[in-house]
């Protein structure tokens, strides 16, 4: 059975997305990238950009399930901004009536590298290896989103 998995790495400045297609043990990379919002733009407008662009990603790829990274931050100010963006993401996913799976950063690192405290490069190398990419996926937020999607596939 073919299944499309959309991985999301929520952020206000840059929201990463990655779409993979799976069929039994076969895996195909369909698309990855970021939804970017201008830093000096009003917060309401930035959230609107995320809202509209995420709808476009969902309409283009029609995923069967969405895997999203759970919120985990060190700086309080940044956490609040990301939480606002994450709220918009969850609203859009609810509007599309999509099942959502959430993973912590440690769960994602463990699934991809076998080590829950792996660094970003180790995770990106694992993503590149699993998807047979010639180079590490960029930007970082898109690579993180692909890692989330792969985690959902591994946990099936």
UniProtKB/Swiss-Prot annotation:
Kindly list the GO CC terms recorded for this protein.
cytoplasm; Holliday junction resolvase complex
Catalytic residues identified in the record: 9, 69, 141
Q: Provide the residue positions that the database annotates as binding Mg(2+) 2.
A: 69
Q: What molecular function terms (GO) are annotated for this protein? A: crossover junction DNA endonuclease activity; DNA binding; magnesium ion binding
Instruction: Look up the EC number in the record and give it.
Output: 3.1.21.10
Q: Which reaction does it catalyse?
A: Endonucleolytic cleavage at a junction such as a reciprocal single-stranded crossover between two homologous DNA duplexes (Holliday junction)
Chain segments annotated as transmembrane: none
Cofactor(s) it depends on: Mg(2+)
Q: Which Pfam families match?
A: RuvC
Q: Which SUPFAM superfamilies match?
A: Ribonuclease H-like
Major location category of this protein: cytoplasm
Superkingdom in the source lineage: Bacteria
**Subunit details for this protein?**
Homodimer which binds Holliday junction (HJ) DNA. The HJ becomes 2-fold symmetrical on binding to RuvC with unstacked arms; it has a different conformation from HJ DNA in complex with RuvA. In the full resolvosome a probable DNA-RuvA(4)-RuvB(12)-RuvC(2) complex forms which resolves the HJ.
Q: Per its database record, what is this protein's job?
A: The RuvA-RuvB-RuvC complex processes Holliday junction (HJ) DNA during genetic recombination and DNA repair. Endonuclease that resolves HJ intermediates. Cleaves cruciform DNA by making single-stranded nicks across the HJ at symmetrical positions within the homologous arms, yielding a 5'-phosphate and a 3'-hydroxyl group; requires a central core of homology in the junction. The consensus cleavage sequence is 5'-(A/T)TT(C/G)-3'. Cleavage occurs on the 3'-side of the TT dinucleotide at the point of strand exchange.
Q: Which family does it belong to?
A: Belongs to the RuvC family.
Stated name of the protein: Crossover junction endodeoxyribonuclease RuvC
């Amino acid at each position: 059975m073919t299944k499309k998995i959309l991985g999301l790495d929520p952020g206000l400045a840059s929201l990463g997305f990655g779409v993979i297609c799976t069929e039994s043990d076969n895996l195909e990379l369909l698309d990855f990238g970021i939804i970017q919002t201008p830093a000096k733009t009003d917060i309401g407008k930035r959230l609107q950009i995320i809202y509209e662009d995420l709808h476009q990603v969902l309409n283009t790829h029609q995923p069967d399930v969405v895997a999203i990274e759970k919120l985990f931050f060190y700086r309080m100010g940044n956490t609040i901004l990301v939480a606002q963006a994450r709220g918009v993401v969850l609203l859009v996913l609810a509007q599309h009536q999509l099942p959502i799976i959430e993973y912590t950063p440690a769960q994602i690192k463990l699934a991809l590298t076998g080590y829950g405290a792996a660094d970003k490069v180790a995770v990106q190398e694992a993503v590149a290896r699993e998807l047979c990419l010639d180079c590490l996926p960029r930007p970082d937020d898109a690579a993180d989103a692909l890692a989330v999607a792969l985690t959902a596939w591994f946990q099936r």
